[in-house]
């Protein structure tokens, strides 16, 4: 899991 802006969550 990678967290971007804090409001956006991307599943890798």
Swiss-Prot record:
One of its GO terms (biological process) is adaptive immune response. It comes from the Eukaryota. Disulfide bonds: none annotated. It is found in: Secreted; Cell membrane. One of its GO terms (cellular component) is immunoglobulin complex. The keyword Secreted applies. Transmembrane segments: none annotated. Keywords: Adaptive immunity, Cell membrane, Immunity, Immunoglobulin, Membrane, Secreted. J region of the variable domain of immunoglobulin kappa light chains that participates in the antigen recognition. Immunoglobulins, also known as antibodies, are membrane-bound or secreted glycoproteins produced by B lymphocytes. In the recognition phase of humoral immunity, the membrane-bound immunoglobulins serve as receptors which, upon binding of a specific antigen, trigger the clonal expansion and differentiation of B lymphocytes into immunoglobulins-secreting plasma cells. Immunoglobulins are composed of two identical heavy chains and two identical light chains; disulfide-linked. This is Immunoglobulin kappa joining 1. It comes from Homo sapiens (Human). The gene is IGKJ1.
């Amino acid at each position: 899991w990678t967290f971007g802006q804090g409001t956006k969550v991307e599943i890798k």
